[in-house]
Regions:
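Phosphate-handling active-site elements
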Residues: 36-40, 196-198, 223-237
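Charged C-terminal helix
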Residues: 8, 59, 231-278
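Acidic-glycine-rich active-site phosphate/pyrophosphate-binding loop
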Residues: 2-7, 13, 24, 184-199
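Conserved N-terminal subdomain of the carbohydrate kinase-like
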Residues: 2-13, 30-121, 266-267
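Short pre-catalytic strand/loop immediately N-terminal to key active-site residues, enriched for Gly-Thr
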Residues: 14-20, 197-210
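Conserved phosphate/ATP/ADP-binding segment of small-molecule kinases
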Residues: 122-197
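Short, small-residue alpha-helix embedded
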Residues: 31, 151, 207-230
């Protein structure tokens, strides 16, 4: 039997399908490919959405989720796992069982609980509790925005207190993104060992974007798969995601879409911020 040698790192993604291509699985694939990795995907939910709103969604049967994932894990050397929208409590339980079987694989969890506009709930209280109990303790890096952070840790009187409360759930690193905060710049904070590890400031761009959280989390997962240590991966993924937003475009009647493939299309910009390490 001929041995198959991997040519690029493999990332396994659990996420929902977005027909607009702005968020969800398509966003994950584009960001992971941009990090020089191969994206494999497990669909957890089918959504009806456009660039303006999520109209409704249907969770994929949990047994099908399990079969999709195990088919990949038994065939390819997965180097990182990224989790986005999970769709149901049953899917949380299935993903938990898979993570338990592969404890050596780093996990990036973008805890999607509402649409980007915040108008549509994508996770009820039972699902939130299940994620916190079953997935957070097995997560290498958790990437909530500040609104999600306050939902998961409602007792904290400020973001640092909320972050410390969430770290008690067992995740190793926590990156809180500040897009929703009323600050001149976007301030993202990385926590580890119950302390602020670093703070990243980014120019606040005009307008709103569909799929920015998916883009950032998947880029980090791709860099994890490349073997990059967490602090550096978080910094470089933010550089990539911010450039994708800067070069974003509006082709629908709602939010702008990140241009995750800007590097392949060329640009009139002189920006050379995004450079992956050799």
């Amino acid at each position: 039997m001929t041995e198959v040698l991997p040519t690029v790192p493999v990332v396994l993604v659990f996420a929902g399908h977005d027909p607009s291509g702005g968020a969800g699985i398509q966003a994950d694939i584009e960001a992971i490919v941009s990090m020089g990795c191969h994206a494999t995907t497990v669909i957890t939910a089918l959504t009806v959405q456009d660039t303006a709103e999520v109209k409704r969604f249907v969770a994929v049967d949990s047994m099908l989720v399990m079969e999709q994932a195990r088919a990949i894990l038994e065939d390819m050397p997965v180097a990182a796992i990224k989790i986005g929208m999970v769709g149901s409590v049953e899917n949380v339980e299935v993903i938990h069982s898979i993570l338990m079987d592969y404890p050596q694989i780093p996990v990036v969890l973008d805890p999607v609980i509402a649409s980007g506009s915040g108008a549509t709930e994508l996770a009820d209280e039972e699902m939130i509790d299940a994620m916190m109990e079953l997935l957070f303790p097995l997560t290498t890096l958790l990437t909530p925005n500040s609104l999600e952070l306050r939902t998961f840790a409602p007792d904290g009187d400020n973001l640092d207190a909320c972050a410390h409360e969430l770290l008690e759930s067992g995740c190793e690193y926590l990156l809180v993104t500040g897009t929703h905060e009323n600050t001149p710049d976007v301030v993202n904070v990385l926590y580890n060992n119950f302390r602020r590890m670093d703070e990243f400031r980014w120019e606040r761009l005009e307008g709103s974007y569909h799929g920015s959280g998916c883009t950032l989390a998947s880029a980090i997962a791709g860099l994890f798969a490349q073997g990059m240590e967490p602090h550096t991966a978080v910094r470089e993924a933010q550089e990539y995601a911010h450039e994708a937003l800067k070069q974003g475009y509006r082709i629908g009647m709602g939010q702008r879409l990140p241009n995750r493939l800007f590097w392949a299309q060329g640009s009139e910009s002189d920006d050379d911020t995004f450079k992956t390490d050799e």
